[in-house]
Amino acid sequence: VNDAPALRAASIGVALGSGTEVAKEASDLVLLNNSFSIIVAAIEEGRRVIDNLRKIVVYLLSTSGSEIIVVGGALMIGLPLPLLPAQILWTNILSEGFMNFSFAFEPKESDLMRRDPRVVGAKQLVSRRLMGFVVTVGLLSGLLLLALYWYLVTLLGLQESDAQTLMFTALNLTMVFSVFSFKDLRAPIWKTRFFTNPYLFASIGFSFFGLLVAFMVEPITKILRLAPFDPMSHLGLLAGIILTNIALVEVAKFLFFPRKGGV
């Protein structure tokens, strides 16, 4: 189309690379190879990018929300700080940060091109449904970790440093293992394609490496104020927290996205 007024009036004006300069300046999209088939591939890639951007935002807000709940909740009920600022910073950089990075490389989902078109902007990127999911997951995960901290301090009678060390470990592990639930918000974790994103497993490896460094490199251990820790003595408790957290995320997914559909 070389009709400049029509291109300006269209929702998305498309001009050919061989068209006039006036038409190309008036259009939103210029097909350099003069082939309309590239439009489908461009739409598919655009939808994949938006999908992955949503996953990054949802994962970041959900995990950050759980940290706010556990720290704020502990202070409200009169417990000592469950996590120190340095521990939270370490977790956000080495666990949360790497996970967010890996979501950018998620492949497209199977129903991507079967979804209805929708306008996407700053306000539409995270819908009310997604925000409801974020708040629910952040609240449930935060309350789970808060209950763990209350159990460690009140019932087990652990020293503050020992309880904080266990909370630091639990927070990192729940963030790492729950990432698989965020790979596909429209499908349960048992239907998720686990091995489609090698960057995700690289991020998990970096996160575990960061956790080992925190405990094994003495200067960092002192900065984070971590107590001597034997993971085997708390293996059952940590496994239970990880599995319960995944179950809570899956329940929230079922409530907000009960079947394949738009997000």
Task: Go through the PLM ranges and name each one.
Residues V1-A10:
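Acidic, divalent-metal-coordinating active-site segment for phosphoryl/phosphodiester hydrolysis
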Residues A10, S18-R186:
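Membrane-embedded transport module
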Residues T169-V263:
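C-terminal transmembrane module of polytopic membrane proteins
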